[in-house]
UniProtKB/Swiss-Prot annotation:
It comes from the Eukaryota. The keyword Glycoprotein applies. Residues 1-28 form the signal peptide. The keyword Transmembrane does not apply. Keywords: Developmental protein, Glycoprotein, Secreted, Signal. It comes from Drosophila madeirensis. This is Protein yellow. One of its GO terms (cellular component) is extracellular region. Belongs to the major royal jelly protein family. Its main location: secreted. It is found in: Secreted. InterPro entries: 6-blade_b-propeller_TolB-like, Royal_jelly/protein_yellow. Glycans are attached at residues 151, 222. The lineage of its organism: Eukaryota, Metazoa, Ecdysozoa, Arthropoda, Hexapoda.
Length: 568
């Protein structure tokens, strides 16, 4: 028996291991692990009867809901669902991860149903996009106040910052952006939060994608100001063509969008990196400038242009860890990319941490939580906007993985000697012609992160790999064990196969042209019908006295129903 093991099984096992080792990373090296997935979104209604009534009345239309933002805190995973179409019962929701470890959980309105009533400007949130939890346990949510998308957009409410205490689940502040901070084209879908010396020394930065501006908000002053019309906020006219999931479309007007913040530098400030959506380039500015209201009209040369990331490098979401690793979505490549901020900003310093031509079609949001775990939401957004999703297929996914696992053996993994950064990477502040530069450089990273990364034992280092920018296209191979997706329906290598019928035009499912990436915010003062399809009619009696289903349930506020969502 032992002789047979040595002469037959072990050599065969060795050959198997060699064969597995030769499988390309694009086929088998799935680092992100699928945590949740849905064919279509479902919501945690107070009871089955109210859900049935909402379906019958059109207050809940499952196929109209698209998740766009994700954020993690404790045992909750927050998911935002904008009100682009009718039938979205809640825009700010969460998953109780203690109750739903995996699967397709119902989304629970946060903090309750009442706070998700569309058009109730002072008390509720109409539409939320991307959100941020800060290190002080606060959830920052910008309510765009909009309902609809493209030419169907109305503005029942003004832009307002809503901040929640995640310990008490109460809103602790609401701040409306003044008229001076917006313009007729304003559309804001991204937020970055900057915590300084303490929790009161907090700023939030908002990217105005279509109004081409950057807005700063001070928690301590409870005041905001706008940096307007810098040329770096505008789209690149050569980068407005997109190809996702077999659909060719143009988002040529999309300006400043994704943002990330570095760790605090030696001068006490951070660097804000940002990119227009229609661009392959990244830009930077010190928060020393953004925190100073007096610099809104005198800061042009404080903004710095970096190189392009490489081809097919449109991005909508970016985030940086506290040790300087930036992650970002690559929507053209069905991938998540990385760059270590101690290295030059060049294509050679960028890498792919994971890619999936099925599961990561439009990775809409990327976040790093307090435990250095990465969360990625993919939603097939262009198919939803410009064609039709196949709701018998999995359309929405949330993935997760430790940050260290994702960057291992990439150009961003400085534990690997093959990718050592130069001693100093510095971009000095640019001075206006005829003037000398003053103040500290924009950033100076003299191996400031290497000491942190090198604390891990040598045995954790990955093998030396050749430098490469991007991995090749995913080649479907249903025979690979451990694949996180069912690849049985994949076609030829590199071919994206889907049962979704896609087109190359920019016409939505109802024949409405949708030339924009998201809502085109007109601020056009249109009156909003309170009895229309997006709002629940105002009803005074308690739910027990009425039979109007969810519409009644939401508006009978004196009953305190929202404190008991799980009854029934």
């Amino acid at each position: 028996m032992h002789a047979q093991d040595k002469g037959g099984i072990l050599p065969a096992l060795s050959l198997l291991l060699i064969a597995v080792a030769m499988v390309s990373p694009s086929q088998a090296a799935y680092k992100l692990q699928e945590r949740y997935s849905w064919n279509q979104l479902d919501f945690a209604f107070p009871n089955a009867r109210l859900k049935e009534q909402a379906l019958a009345s059109g207050d809940y239309i499952p196929t109209n809901a698209l998740p766009v933002g994700v954020e993690h805190f404790g045992n909750r995973l927050f998911v935002t669902v904008p009100r682009w179409r009718d039938g979205i019962p809640a825009t700010l929701t969460y998953i109780n991860m203690d109750h739903s470890v995996t699967g397709s959980p119902e989304l629970i309105p946060y903090p309750d149903w009442r706070a998700n009533t569309a058009g109730d400007c002072a008390n509720s949130i109409t539409t939320a996009y991307r959100i941020k939890v800060d290190e002080c346990g606060r959830l920052w949510v910008l309510d765009t106040g909009t309902v609809g998308i493209g030419n169907t957009t109305t503005n029942p409410c003004p832009y307002a910052i809503n901040i929640f205490d995640l310990t008490t689940n109460t809103r602790i502040r609401r701040y409306e952006l003044p008229a001076a901070d917006t313009n007729p084209n304003t559309f804001i879908a991204n937020i970055a939060v900057d915590i300084g010396k303490n929790c009161d020394d907090a700023f939030a930065y908002f990217a105005d994608e279509l109004g081409y501006g950057l807005i700063s908000y001070s928690w301590e002053l409870n005041k905001s100001w706008r940096f307007s019309a810098h040329s770096y906020f505008f789209p690149d006219p050569l980068r407005g063509d997109f190809n996702v999931a077999g659909i060719n479309f143009q988002w040529g007007e999309e300006g400043i969008f994704g943002m990330s913040l570095t760790p605090i530098r030696s001068d006490g400030y951070r660097t804000l990196y940002f990119s227009p959506l229609a661009s392959h380039r990244q830009f930077a500015v010190s928060t020393r400038i953004l925190r100073d209201e007096t610099r809104t009209e005198d800061s042009y040369h404080d903004f710095v242009a970096l190189d392009e990331r490489g081809p097919n490098a449109h991005t909508t979401s970016r985030v940086m860890s506290d040790d300087g690793v930036e992650l970002f979505n690559l929507i053209d490549q069905n991938a998540v990319g990385c760059w270590h901020s101690s290295m030059p900003y060049s294509p050679q310093s960028h890498g792919i941490v994971d890619r999936d031509d099925v599961g990561l079609v439009f990775p809409a949001d990327v976040k790093i939580d307090e435990n250095k775990n990465v969360w990625v939401l993919s939603d097939r957004m262009p198919v939803f906007l410009l064609s039709d999703l196949d709701y018998s297929d999995t359309n929405f996914r949330i993935y997760t993985a430790p940050l260290a696992t994702l960057i291992e053996n990439t150009v961003c993994d400085l534990r690997n000697n093959a990718y050592g950064p130069p001693n100093t990477v510095s971009i000095p502040k640019q001075a206006a012609p005829g003037h000398s530069a003053v103040g500290p450089p924009l950033y100076t990273t003299t191996n400031q992160y290497r000491s942190l990364l090198s604390q891990k034992p040598q045995t954790s280092w990955g093998p030396s790999l050749p430098s490469r920018n991007y991995l090749p296209a995913l080649n479907g191979n249903p025979g690979i064990p451990g694949s996180r997706n069912n690849l049985n329906n994949l076609g030829a290598p590199g071919q994206v196969v889907s049962s979704v019928s896609v087109s190359t035009n920019t016409v939505g499912p109802s024949g409405i042209e949708v030339p924009k990436a998201y809502v085109f915010n007109q601020h056009n003062g249109l009156n909003y019908e309170t009895s229309g399809p997006h709002l629940f009619p105002t009803l005074q009696p308690a739910p027990s006295q009425l039979g109007g289903g969810l519409k009644t349930y939401v508006n009978a506020r004196q009953s305190g129903w929202w404190l008991h969502q799980q009854q029934g």
